[in-house]
């Protein structure tokens, strides 16, 4: 018996429409664990450690009382307590992303810090929802890539062809074809993900089509319970 028998992971590729599917599921009253939101919260809670490991330039202070401080000033990192004691600090995700995107060694350091905490929080929320004995969903964008969530054994892939993914990323992010193609190809190919899925939600049409596809998926899943 699976540990989380009422859970279904929602995943896909960049540009496939995972967020839209999750919104449609919320509209139908289903509870959803959002791995991205958890990751953002964990990242900010770990601001002190991020500064110690990668540099204080990746931490920003947002307290209104110090809003006029020199934005280029670096925080002291002689101890984590000094940064974590600030009224409101967070990680500059854009700057941090630029660092780890180009530097696998720094990315590995960040992942070693964050991933155990993220996984623990996802597990905690899943255990709470499992106790309700109702169907719920776990939105994990990089489910297949991460290989850290084998305790969830039912997976729905939101699918669109690769050319559609690239076009959407170009439009959404204002990228060139080559840049968008590169981002799409950083992830496991969408055709491989479709082959590994228990359920496929097709998203190549308009929003009404996606509503219909999501409804069909729910009907199949609910009939299996």
Outline where the language-model segments fall.
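Hydrophobic anchor at the beta1->P-loop junction of P-loop NTPases
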Residues: 10
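P-loop (Walker A) phosphate-binding loop of NTP-binding proteins
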Residues: 13
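ATP-binding Walker
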Residues: 16
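Walker A/P-loop
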Residues: 19
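N-terminal phosphate/diphosphate-binding loop that engages ATP/GTP or pyrophosphate donors
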Residues: 23-105
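Phosphate-binding/switch loop-helix module in NTP-utilizing enzymes
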Residues: 99, 103-133
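ATP-dependent NMP and nucleoside kinases share a basic, alpha-helical "lid"
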Residues: 121-131, 135-171
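Small-molecule kinase domains that catalyze NTP-dependent phosphoryl transfer to phosphate-bearing small molecules
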Residues: 121-122, 129, 150-151, 171, ...
